[in-house]
């Protein structure tokens, strides 16, 4: 029986959830969820100067918006410092690590001299093989004994086999002279203790894997499966930055992108399943595999994001969509909907969601059901309500009062009235849009009348005709 899959997302809480981090989290989530495994969350907060509770909260909020639920409690790397130190001392006791008494000044001087002579600046500690009897009574760091020759092969599921000559690796510090563990050690110990089977992360960590493998092998632990994914670039092929647009996951929520569309788009950034562009979460979980991840950086394309978001809005459940829109309004710092507006929005959703790519677009179309009497009208709407049009609307009102208020009945009544006036319905549509929405561009007149209901429709007509 194969070992259950366990993945993890391990961000540093020094800022918001970057869009690249969000994709890394998504890949780990999809891989675990599609295999009945576990997806764990670890906050790598060992850098106490830069780690903040606010950044941790922002990361958790970003993941919650994206719907990337994790198993178990959130793990704090900082809280595991004692365990990390324990492993360093175990390696020291087993002769796989050693005490290094070289000071920062000595190491800096060595590197400066090596650089001046055109030699490698890789530091080789003079304390590696020094007997303990010759050790001074002074602070020391604990360094791992890296292999001096041979090669380390990273068997990566995305990059293929990557070979590193061991001569390129130094005796990495495990424990600083103040007793604090370094990041490289903490990551390995945490991944092992959490039972992580697959490490899916950015390819900027690829070289770290060779150094981390030294610790796994020294401890006799199984090395996890590595998959180092390419970074995300902007549309111009350069590293994603502020000039390409928003960088934080929550910024996209505040701009009104649906989470399902964002998940779909991020999944397609660097991963593919044939020619499929649009897919649901369930399909993504079933299809996602490490073999489908490419080696080249993916390019962020806002138009593709919007197109996918539009498709997800179109198929969304009306009640769920209304709830997500209300969460968007909160995230964007906009006024909340009252109960009447909320109910009206959900009732009208069927005629709003087909062509909207973002929530602001959808809410613009929903203006007719969110506004209240007396309506404010834009310039085009005011122009449509000339005296002749108002007179025609006045004549139309009795015909609507007796209609059954089904779509078929309303269409029949309006077309019959237009024929009697020797005109076409299109001539009535402009004034009716102005009356019902105060705008010239709206959903179908019939959809607006159905959503508003008889009483509100007639009241808006009366406001204009008197």
Curated annotation (Swiss-Prot):
This is Glutamate--tRNA ligase 1. Catalyzes the attachment of glutamate to tRNA(Glu) in a two-step reaction: glutamate is first activated by ATP to form Glu-AMP and then transferred to the acceptor end of tRNA(Glu). GO terms for biological process: glutamyl-tRNA aminoacylation. PANTHER family: GLUTAMATE--TRNA LIGASE, GLUTAMATE--TRNA LIGASE, MITOCHONDRIAL-RELATED. ATP binds at residue 242. GO terms for cellular component: cytosol. PROSITE patterns: AA_TRNA_LIGASE_I. NCBIfam families: gltX_bact (TIGR00464). Belongs to the class-I aminoacyl-tRNA synthetase family. Glutamate--tRNA ligase type 1 subfamily. Its EC number is 6.1.1.17. It comes from the Bacteria. Signal peptide: none annotated. A motif ('KMSKS' region) lies at residues 239-243. It catalyses: tRNA(Glu) + L-glutamate + ATP = L-glutamyl-tRNA(Glu) + AMP + diphosphate. Monomer. SUPFAM superfamilies: An anticodon-binding domain of class I aminoacyl-tRNA synthetases, Nucleotidylyl transferase. The gene is gltX1. Keywords: Aminoacyl-tRNA synthetase, ATP-binding, Cytoplasm, Ligase, Nucleotide-binding, Protein biosynthesis. GO terms for molecular function: ATP binding; glutamate-tRNA ligase activity; tRNA binding; zinc ion binding. It is found in: Cytoplasm. A motif ('HIGH' region) lies at residues 11-21.
């Amino acid at each position: 029986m194969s070992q259950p899959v366990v993945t993890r997302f391990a961000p540093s809480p020094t800022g918001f959830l970057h869009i690249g981090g969000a994709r890394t989290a998504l890949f780990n989530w999809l891989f675990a969820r599609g295999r009945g495994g576990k997806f764990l969350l670890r906050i790598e907060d060992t850098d106490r100067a830069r780690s903040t509770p606010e950044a941790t909260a922002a990361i958790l909020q970003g993941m919650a918006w994206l719907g990337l639920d994790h198993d178990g409690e959130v793990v704090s790397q900082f809280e595991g410092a004692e365990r990390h130190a324990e492993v360093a001392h175990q390696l020291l006791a087993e002769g796989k690590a050693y005490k290094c008494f070289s000071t920062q000044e000595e190491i800096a001087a060595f590197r400066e001299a090596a650089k001046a002579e055109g030699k490698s600046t890789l530091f080789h500690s003079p304390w590696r093989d020094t007997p303990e009897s010759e050790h001074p009574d002074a602070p020391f760091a604990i360094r791992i004994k890296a292999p001096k020759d041979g090669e380390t092969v990273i068997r990566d599921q995305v990059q293929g086999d990557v070979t590193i000559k061991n001569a390129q690796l130094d005796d990495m510090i495990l424990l600083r002279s103040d007793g604090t563990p370094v990041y490289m050690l903490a990551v390995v110990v945490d991944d092992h203790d959490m039972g992580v089977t697959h490490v899916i992360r950015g390819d900027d960590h690829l070289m770290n894997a060779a150094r981390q493998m030294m610790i796994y092998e020294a401890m006799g632990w199984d090395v996890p499966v590595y998959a180092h994914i390419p970074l995300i670039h902007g549309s111009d092929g350069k590293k994603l930055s502020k000039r390409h647009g928003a960088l934080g996951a929550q910024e996209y929520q505040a701009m009104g992108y649906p989470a399902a569309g964002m998940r779909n788009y991020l999944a397609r950034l660097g991963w593919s399943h044939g020619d499929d562009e649009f897919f649901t979460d369930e399909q993504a979980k079933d299809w996602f595999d490490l073999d489908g991840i490419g080696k080249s950086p993916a390019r962020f394309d806002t138009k593709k994001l919007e197109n996918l978001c539009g498709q997800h809005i179109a198929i969304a459940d009306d009640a769920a969509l209304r709830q997500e829109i209300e969460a968007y309004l909160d995230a964007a710092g906009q006024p909340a909907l009252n109960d009447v507006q909320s109910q009206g929005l959900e009732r009208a959703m069927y005629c709003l969601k087909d062509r909207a790519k973002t929530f602001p677009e959808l809410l613009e179309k929903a203006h007719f059901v969110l506004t209240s009497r007396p309506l404010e009208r834009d310039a085009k709407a005011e122009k449509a309500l000339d005296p002749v049009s108002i007179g025609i609307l006045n004549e139309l009102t009795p015909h609507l009062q007796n209609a059954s208020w089904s779509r078929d009945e309303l269409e029949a009544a309006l077309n019959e009235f237009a024929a009697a006036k020797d005109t076409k319905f299109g001539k009535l549509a402009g004034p009716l849009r102005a009356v019902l929405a105060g705008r010239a561009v709206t959903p179908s007149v019939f959809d607006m009348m159905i959503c508003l209901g008889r009483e509100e429709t007639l009241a808006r007509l009366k406001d204009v005709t008197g």
